[in-house]
Amino acid sequence: MDLLIVSGLSGAGKSVAMNALEDIGFFCIDNVPAELLPSITAFSKAGDNQLKRVALSMDVRGCHTSEQIEQALHQLDEQGIEYEILFIDAPDDVLMRRYSETRRRHPISIAEGISTREALAKERQILQPFRERADYTINTEFLSTAQNKERICNLFAPDGGAKAAMRLTVCLLYTSPSPRDISGS
């Protein structure tokens, strides 16, 4: 089983990453609590449930302290479960702008009644174990949604990236094409 743990700051692009991973064949589970990580991975490997490629999204909604994260990762290590970590990040000013543009509130801001800036600082501290152990870190500061998705596909698609598709549309205004034009001769 290929196990990928996806984490990162709220608003940095985890949902885009998870959607891209699902598009390239990963079985994706969002918002996994730290306490359930070892159980979910064991279930994913067991008998008829054996899944080939699993991506688990973990963030501050299910991981309330850095100690919980450390303990969950330690349990995976003790069980001999191999995994990789993808950490999605962006600078605080970019995340603040994204929250402002979408008019959404940060999950910690809602739960604890603190400012978005304070919530981001707390979130960075909580998620630090993921960041420190990350095999891949993507800074989405200068990436569009499409570029973020493309980067994920290039990293994790079995063939090394999504195949390019090209569509050609021809408009014939005044005449039909001759058979020679269609055959390419």
Annotate the PLM regions.
Residues 13:
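Conserved glycine(s) of the Walker
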Residues 30, 40-73:
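Conserved nucleotide-sensing/catalytic segment adjacent to the nucleotide-binding pocket
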Residues 174-185:
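Single conserved hydrophobic/aromatic residue that forms the stacking wall/gate
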Residues 6:
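Hydrophobic anchor at the beta1->P-loop junction of P-loop NTPases
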Residues 134-145, 172-173:
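Phosphate-binding beta-loop-alpha motif at adenosine-nucleotide cofactor sites
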